[in-house]
Amino acid sequence: MDILCGIEWDQFSDDKRAGYDYWIGSVHYLHGANTGKYYEIDFRKQDLAACIADDFGGDGLAAAEAYFRSVAEVAALGPDILGHIDLIKKLNRDGDFFDENAPRYRAAAMGALEAAHAAGCLLEVNTGGVFRGYRDDFYPSGWLLEAWAKMGGKVIITADAHSVDGLTYGYEEAARQVKAAGFASVQVLTGAGFETQEI
C-alpha cells in the first residue's frame, strides 16, 4: 500500500502548498465585502443565510457566482486535484438559497469548469456530501460532469472521508455515474503518480 502525504488547500489557507506529494485546491469560504466577514459556506445553514443576507443583498445566486469565481481563482493555481467544484450546493438540497438550474448559476459553474480545464486540473468526483446526509447527489452535479467529459477532462473519485467508515463510500455508484457521463476511465493516485484506470 502506498501512503502519500497531501493537503487540501483552501483559498484562504495560510499553509504553503509545497512539500507535499499532492495538493487539492478547494473553496470553503466566501468573503463578504460589506461586513469583512469570512463565511463558511458548507457547515451551518445560518452562516450561509447570513452571508447571502448581509453581503449579497439577499441574492443567493450572487453568492453562488462569487463562490464559483473563487473556485476559478483556485483552479488557475494548478492544483493536482480541484476539490468539490460545486460545494456551494451542499446546504441547498431543498433549494432554500438558490435555484441550481437557474441560468446564472449554471453560467457561473461553467466559468469555474472552464478555468479548471484551462489549468489542466483533475476534477474530483466527491461522494462525501451524500455519505454525510447533506445531498442526494455527488459533487459535481451530473450536468457539470457531462460538460467536463465533453471538454476532455479527467476525473478522480474520492470520498472526502472524515472517518474510516466513509473511506470508499459510494465509489461503485460514482463510477457508474462517471461512465454514464461519457468517461471511459478515471485517475487513481499511486506512489508513482496518477495512473489511468478503465471503468
Give the label of every model feature segment.
Residues G95-I199:
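Charged catalytic cores and adjacent phosphate/nucleic-acid-binding surfaces used
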